[in-house]
Amino acid sequence: SHNHYDHLDINSLVKISKKNPDAQFLVPQGDKKILTKRGIENVSEFLWWENSIVKNLKMTFTPVQHWSARGLGDRNKSLWGGWFFETTELNLFHAGDTGYSNDFIMTKEKLGAPEYALIPIGAYSPEWFMAENHVNPEDALQIAIDLDAKKSIGMHWGTFILTDEAVTEPPQLLQSALKERGLPKDYFVTLKPGDYELINN
């Protein structure tokens, strides 16, 4: 989704590439060199709204509100975004990191509503500093509504301590937001490590 170290771990990608030499890597415009410098081939860069089709899977790179950098001199020299995955069976949206914006309304208008959406819910405190680039759980719920996703799964919480909120706070605030809006608990869920969500059509 973007080149921040907690989202683009080059050592993990090198291992994936070695175990799967035919793997194709889709990255935002400007990030290909990060992979090719480490010997990873089959890398394609994408601008917003560009897509690729592999077998029966169509992947479209979508705009979100965030930023990029891996060092001091490369801020916003590459893109950031979400990915919209389409198959004949279902559509899934992965938001990457994002602040709240109208990008999600545009994504729904251009690509349709996803059955599933993976939306970040953590790393938002203090909000005066983080809100532009990281949604809080209430804004994450609004993204799910903007996308008209049938079901959403909260991500980007409980793994790395990046900001000031308690590790357990994002799911609690999400449940409060669902209750406040009169939405069922299973409309937008969170999973603990080892949990899974069965995806069926």
PLM regions with names:
Residues 46-112, 176, 193-201:
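Core dinuclear metal-dependent hydrolase active-site scaffold
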Residues 1-19:
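Di-metal (Zn2+ and/or Mg2+/Mn2+) metal-binding site signature of metallo-dependent hydrolases
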Residues 12, 24-26, 30-33, 91, ...:
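Cap/insert and terminal regions of metallo-dependent hydrolase folds
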Residues 35-47:
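Helix-loop-beta element that forms the nucleotide-linked donor phosphate-binding surface
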Residues 5, 31-32, 50:
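Alpha-helix capping/helix-boundary segments
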Residues 43, 59, 187-188:
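Generic structural signal for residues in well-ordered beta-strands
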Residues 13-22, 86-92:
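Short, surface-exposed connector motifs at secondary-structure boundaries
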Residues 2-7, 66-68, 94, 134, ...:
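Histidine-centered active-site/metal-ligand motif
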